[in-house]
Amino acid sequence: FPKDGRPQPAELVPQLNGEHITIAERMKEAGYASAFLGKWHVAPSSGKGGKVDDAVSPNGQGFDLNVGGTSYGGPPSFFSPYRNAELEDGPKGEYLPDRLVEETIDFIDANKGKPWMAHLWFYTVHWPMQAPEPLLRKYADRKGPGLNDTRYGAMIEAMDLAIGRVLSALEKKKNDKDTLVIFTSDNGGFAGVSDCRPLRESKGHLYEGGI
């Protein structure tokens, strides 16, 4: 807040532009193969299934492989059919985080012995609130402080298990000692289904709870 107590709007950059240099472009210069898997959401839709213009797609921004990267902030469905222009449907009922992990491991296998970088940006946690039935049952009676919607907990555990599969694959391939794994988030907790207290506010705000 400024001294007059009036909040000022933050500048909004609606999409990547040509002058923006991505880490994928820099890593390509260094000889790395790169893959983007999951939520792109930095360019407007220009076609069916969330498709974006090539120049502002993951491929246009330096990534060699794009799996599921579209204009979507949240997927039409976390279960196949996905209705995603950059992701072929899997078997009916396939869960999106599991599919993205399979694609990630396939990319790692395809680049064995080479330097590589994978950006695995799960759509989790986002609307629609969907998780595998066994996890929904597990969390069905676990409402309480910080968990206002039990589906939220189920989705987080599903993502946690998916990440564990990537780490296990790296260990099995003996790449776990020379691979840098960064786990981070793009925003705070989701208001309505979670509770960020004692931090103020939640996703969509510039207070601590939102970042």
PLM region spans:
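Formylglycine-dependent sulfatase
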Residues: 1-211
